[in-house]
Structures are given as C-alpha cells and as structure tokens.
Amino acid sequence: MKVVYFSFSGNVRRFIKKAEITNTMEITQNNCTEKIEEPFILVTGTIGFGEVPQPVQSFLDINHDLLRGVAASGNRNWGQNFAKAGRSISEKYQVPLLMKFEVQGTQNDISEFKDKVGQFNEDYGREEIQSY
C-alpha cells in the first residue's frame, strides 16, 4: 500500500527513509492538490497546537476517499497536543490511528510501523482476491 507523508522539518521523511518503504509519495506545496488513484496510509507531523498541516489538509480534501489509516509524529513536550493531527484525521475521516511516534521515531516505532503497513498490504490483497 502506498505511504503518503508530509514532513515539515524532515523528521517524518527520516522516519519513512529508515522504514525502507519504497511505495511512497511526499506531500509538498507543489503537489498537495494532486489526485492519486490508489489507497494509502498517511504519515504526518503536527504543527502549532495540534493542527493538521495545511498541505496535508489540502491533499485530504481531494484524496480522503482512498485514505486507509494514519500515523502521526509529534513532540511529547506538547502534552495533550502530542501528535494530535493524527487523532484529528482519524476522527474526521473514520480511519484507524495506527500509531503516534515522537520526532523521527525509535527503532521500535519503525518496526511497528513496518508491521502495520505489511498487515494493511496483506488485508488489501485479500480484499482484492475476494472481490472476484
């Protein structure tokens, strides 16, 4: 499954790179209004007091129908606003919040994320096979 991500400060980009996931797309100001054609998992940071970054919201306005899950990065110093963008997206679009991780994640976070993406790939494959 495609992993679409937004990295304001480079932390999420480093997380994705360490996870060695190849089917990815980085949301930027230049492509945030681009329509994609396949289901995806979103990974995003949180800005301000728990807000969804504007490029992510613009992307979701167009592509939310293909969103299957979300993971969020944040800083625990923000307390209850830690990775709040993930919770907001999960609630708004009724998709699972797969995980929250701090800054660029630990090795355990990366392993957990890879496992969850792998499970989505297996489940999505089964759905495709069963739909025949």
Swiss-Prot record:
One of its GO terms (molecular function) is FMN binding. GO terms for biological process: protein modification process. It comes from the Bacteria. SUPFAM superfamilies: Flavoproteins. InterPro entries: Flavoprotein-like_sf, RNR_Ib_NrdI_bac, RNR_NrdI. Probably involved in ribonucleotide reductase function. Belongs to the NrdI family. PANTHER family: PROTEIN NRDI. HAMAP family: NrdI (MF_00128). This is Protein NrdI. It comes from Staphylococcus saprophyticus subsp. saprophyticus (strain ATCC 15305 / DSM 20229 / NCIMB 8711 / NCTC 7292 / S-41). The gene is nrdI.
